[in-house]
């Protein structure tokens, strides 16, 4: 639908395998498509509207209607006592992600909010497939699920396009200009969470109060591999620290993802 041929995909994989720069014109085209995906996401109706019209305004209207339908379902299907709490949790997600440290806090949902009051409401949203949780881990070692901290997690929208539609008007235009670093990196992080989730991967991260924070952890070839997301070519201080102390963190290599060429 976007004119990308299998040979282009094969070429891109070859460049990644060899850690070689992608041809500038091909890189620019894939980058353009990535920015479009951030705005459109993967909801079938939104994708169809974009392919048929190429009008972001129509896509945004569909996405915001879907978000409104989610809210209506919360009122329709949830228990009476949970209805306002579910909506509060859902509507807090952009604010949760816009903070420097993106751990989900119930006090952000409502001042004085506690986990025991809202845990069931957040679970309802997760069970509906609207969000994905990303759990903090005790260590940067396998097994990731066995090391997860149940009470510490970030919450991402399952569909990046829906997250962007929940932000203020004009965000889409900024993204098309290549500005993926807004909201303290929330858009770029949620993009990676969207991609990993659609690959069938559970989400984990690593944060310690000493200042070490790795955006994602994944199992790859029998190892724990950190993933650092930097929309710009910023420093990955935590990654350098972890790689510099293999005896402590047991990490041999890491992946840095950004909006730039190899």
What feature does the model see in each segment?
Residues 231-262:
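Catalytic cores of nucleic-acid endonucleases
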Residues 223-225, 253:
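Structural motif
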Residues 48-221:
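Accessory nucleic acid-recognition modules appended to NTPase machines
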Residues 204-205, 226-229:
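Short catalytic-loop micro-motif centered on adjacent basic/acidic residues
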